[in-house]
Swiss-Prot record:
It comes from Trichinella pseudospiralis. One of its GO terms (cellular component) is nucleus. It is found in: Nucleus; Chromosome. Coiled coil: none annotated. This is Histone H3.3. Disulfide bonds: none annotated. It holds the Pfam family Histone.
Amino acid sequence: MARTKQTARKSTGGKAPRKQLATKAARKSAPSTGGVKKPHRYRPGTVALREIRRYQKSTELLIRKLPFQRLVREIAQDFKTDLRFQSAAIGALQEAAEAYLVGLFEDTNLCAIHAKRVTIMPKDIQLARRIRGERA
């Protein structure tokens, strides 16, 4: 389609000026009630998609190191007391644990999508583990 020149047209009157006056009056009265600006909110799902892209790009560990280390030591206490861990061993355990969880959540998401849902539920995790053969 060919581009056409835009020309300004004169208004033929009507109800537009009255509407404008009403909005101006409303605007003047609004700040006097407190002037609190409504905080900006993104639409549902926008932030989630941004976080997905951010975490898929990154390679850093997502679980904090010290809480994970305490958990490992607490679990190890049940098997043998006075166990010592090299920091590299804790790091390797954390890397493996996070890789496992990411894979499990990917499979869980596929189970939810298969059920025509976008929200993952405990039953999706159970199904993913059962299909993997981790739990009968």
